[in-house]
Amino acid sequence: MFGPAKGRHFGVHPAPGFPGGVSQQAAGTKAGPAGAWPVGSRTDTMWRLRCKAKDGTHVLQGLSSRTRVRELQGQIAAITGIAPGGQRILVGYPPECLDLSNGDTILEDLPIQSGDMLIIEEDQTRPRSSPAFTKRGASSYVRETLPVLTRTVVPADNSCLFTSVYYVVEGGVLNPACAPEMRRLIAQIVASDPDFYSEAILGKTNQEYCDWIKRDDTWGGAIEISILSKFYQCEICVVDTQTVRIDRFGEDAGYTKRVLLIYDGIHYDPLQRNFPDPDTPPLTIFSSNDDIVLVQALELADEARRRRQFTDVNRFTLRCMVCQKGLTGQAEAREHAKETGHTNFGEV
């Protein structure tokens, strides 16, 4: 069967005897997974915070609602030169000191919100930071521990989701020919549990869905990502360049690994971390505790959004490649497909 041997080789283990059974609300459509996401997937949102220190006001970059306290302190250290152990972070009026005792606390669990101004002071009751911990040293440390995340472009051939997932779980193997087997795998899983994968979930009968997903002109979405997350037993994070958010599939399942995709409204690409040493292969599988990679993914999405590198699926112009009718947005495309049975669309 597709996946198990190579998945194990790279540390992503398909679930033994996997029958399906992932909670979800709506199937992906020809226009991708915009809209409802599976129950249990979680969204990260980018946060914008400022900090005020002795040398002025600074903008803190690359934070999300799930950034940990220790990562926030690392960035503050890079800006101010105050070691994390000597920081006092105050917020509000009158200013109150945040509890920094647990470095694993995430920002959304603190009494702060995006847009707040943080006041940074040095705790005079603690030993002063050593001369080696300067702004320059801290900045170098942060740069070394935050390698750049990059996108690998895969073919836009209606199977970009499957090619992208294969790429990341196989440790950086680009193989568009994997798509038919992945489609058959998903069809087998769905067919094995018709009670769960009902028409209410799939938007069509179980048999119709299985026939549909095996075609090479249909697009994958939330349903397929959820199934692949459980099959490979890893969290699949999809960062959206239009909304600058991350939807996380399989987060609550206790998986120890995560992989990342970037989505622009109609196309998926895999994300990977490259290293300066050309002999070191790119990293595509991350620890599920590595929240730094999530922040980097949000930064990448935010940059793409500012450059308008996304497609608004509710407004983009399509043409039915069967009858050549012009359509606007995924809603019209979905209705046209329902009325005519035509499902091959191209973007104009």
UniProtKB/Swiss-Prot annotation:
A zinc finger (C2H2-type) spans 318-342. The keyword ATP-binding does not apply. The active site is at D157, C160, H267, H342. Residues 1-39 are annotated as: Disordered. Residues 291-296 are annotated as: S2 site. The keyword Cell division does not apply. GO terms for molecular function: cysteine-type deubiquitinase activity; deubiquitinase activity; K48-linked deubiquitinase activity; K63-linked deubiquitinase activity; ubiquitin protein ligase binding; zinc ion binding. GO terms for cellular component: cytoplasm; cytosol. It is an enzyme of class 3 (hydrolase). It is found in: Cytoplasm. It catalyses: Thiol-dependent hydrolysis of ester, thioester, amide, peptide and isopeptide bonds formed by the C-terminal Gly of ubiquitin (a 76-residue protein attached to proteins as an intracellular targeting signal). Residues 1-11 have a biased composition (Basic residues). Residues 149-274 form the OTU domain. Interacts with VCP; the interaction is direct. Interacts with FAF2/UBXD8. Interacts with DERL1; however interaction is dependent on the UBAX-like region, suggesting that it may be indirect. Interacts with PLAA, UBXN6 and VCP; may form a complex involved in macroautophagy. This is Ubiquitin thioesterase OTU1.
